[in-house]
From Swiss-Prot:
Keywords: Ribonucleoprotein, Ribosomal protein, RNA-binding, rRNA-binding. This is Large ribosomal subunit protein uL4. Belongs to the universal ribosomal protein uL4 family. NCBIfam families: rpl4p_arch.
Length: 267
């Protein structure tokens, strides 16, 4: 059984949001969206960044505590010599953990290389579908067509205000406003650990050059990420396993993605 794909067309916009021309998109934007593969590969890539952790084997055990025995009218928990203070047992203050974290725990999920490639293709295809982008919660003007492809000169934008103006002109700045309004303080101890605020996911800009000025210009805009087409993965395209991120492509980045992934569809 063969999968028959039909190529889509897309309009290319300039910095000011004006239509420049229409181009035919590669097959990677016509692939069926496989949520199951996207989820599997996202979890595989996400868990590869996790660090094993354990506990000191002697934690909670550095004490002289022993049980005084039975028939003394008191609990049989271990007690410190010359003190009588309960220690060592899991139900005591400063006692050991019953089941401490182990470095032997298997944290990393696995996925095949072919699955990883298909997941990226599938996630790219979701970014070209207005239904998926809307369902993910992104906000944009009704006139916006997907996928959003722009001319290569947008990579020369040097300031955050220029990038914001560009996003306004192509009709997706409302999504940045949505992210700004939803920045909130995290519940729990994460506040003490350098991650005080929670921020939603906003637009993704895929470029063809990692050293272009827009990479630094956009990094302080709420929710916006800039990624090289050579490095883009399911982590960027489907954060939290949810496909359909609002994505903006440069014209050359489309060609790079086609060279990188189209062989997977042929084979």
């Amino acid at each position: 059984m063969y999968l028959e794909l039909v190529k889509k067309n897309s309009v290319i916009l300039d910095k000011d949001g004006n239509k420049v021309k229409e181009v035919e998109l590669p097959f990677i934007f016509s692939f069926p969206v496989r949520k199951d593969i996207i989820r599997r590969v996202f979890l595989a890539e996400f868990t590869h960044s996790l660090q094993p952790k354990g506990r000191d084997p002697m934690a909670g055990k550095r004490t002289s505590a022993e049980s005084f025995g039975i028939n003394l009218g008191m609990a049989r928990v271990p007690r410190v010599k010359n003190s009588g203070e309960a220690a060592l047992a899991p139900n005591t203050v400063g006692g050991r953990l019953t089941f401490p974290p182990s470095v032997d725990k298997k944290l990393v999920e696995e996925a095949n290389d072919k699955e990883k490639q298909l997941a990226v293709i599938s996630a790219l295809s979701a970014t070209a579908d207005k239904v998926f982008v809307k369902a993910r919660g992104h906000v944009f003007k009704d006139s916006v067509s997907f996928p959003i492809v722009v001319t290569d000169d947008i990579v020369s934008l040097k300031t955050a205000s220029e990038v914001e103006e560009f996003l306004e002109k192509i009709g997706v700045y409302d999504d940045v406003k949505r992210v700004k309004e939803r920045i909130r303080i995290r519940a729990g101890k994460g506040k003490m650990r350098g991650r005080k605020y929670k921020e939603s996911i906003g637009p993704l800009i895929i470029v063809h050059d990692s050293n272009s000025p827009i990479v630094k210009a956009a990094r302080n805009i709420a929710g916006v990420d800039v990624v090289n087409a050579k490095d883009v993965s399911v982590i960027h395209l489907a954060p939290g396993t949810h496909s359909g991120r609002l994505t903006i492509y440069t014209e050359t980045s489309i060609k790079i993605l086609d060279e990188r992934l189209s062989k997977r569809l042929v084979s």
